[in-house]
Design a protein with these regions (language model features):
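Phosphate-binding P-loop
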Residues: 21-27
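Short hydrophobic/aromatic beta-strand immediately N-terminal to the Walker A/P-loop
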Residues: 29-31
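P-loop (Walker A) phosphate-binding loop of NTP-binding proteins
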Residues: 33-35
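Conserved lysine of the Walker
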Residues: 40
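Short beta-strand-centered segment that lines the nucleotide-binding/catalytic pocket of NTP-utilizing
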Residues: 53-68
Length: 154
């Protein structure tokens, strides 16, 4: 199942993230696809806000990962593998994290760890358009991610 959403501004991208975050209960995996500057971390900032995380989300480009505590014993694990050619130990860590029912896992530049992502991964490709709007293509990999996409499209 693939759906498409157009956002006009960074604020709309954050608001979409807020809505997405409000739908997440833990155990979900989201792969963000897009060029540098497309808005992957911006979307994640909104997602964190929607999960009830007050802490400011920062890009994990140089740290590879950041974890944020959310209400109701949930967590947001945000990964950015842009700088990795080989996942190494991060692949083993990620394999554990995506199995945690309390953790929402968001991964940027996931190609290097793609074989550990669950089948039921929500893939969101963010494409910058000529007029600087963003076209988001949402692909649901399974039942849970399909439900999330259906709720987002309402």
């Amino acid at each position: 199942m693939t759906s498409e959403i157009i956002v006009q501004t960074a604020e709309e991208l954050i608001e979409l993230g807020v809505t997405l975050g409000s739908l997440l209960r833990g155990g979900e995996t989201i792969e963000l696809i897009g060029d540098i500057g497309a808005g992957k971390t911006t979307l994640t900032k909104g997602l964190a806000r929607g999960m009830g995380i007050a802490e400011e989300v920062q890009s994990p480009t140089f740290t590879l990962s950041r974890v944020y505590d959310a209400p109701n014993r949930r967590r947001l694990a945000h990964y950015d593998f842009y700088r990795l050619n080989n996942a190494g130990i991060m692949q083993a860590e990620l394999a554990e994290v995506v199995q945690d029912a309390r953790t929402v896992t968001v991964i940027e530049w996931a190609a290097v760890v793609g074989d550990v992502l669950p089948d039921d991964t929500l893939r969101i490709a963010i494409r910058v358009q000529a007029d600087d709007t963003r076209r988001l293509e949402l692909e649901a990999g399974g039942k849970c991610s399909k439900h999330i996409v259906q709720e987002l499209m309402k």
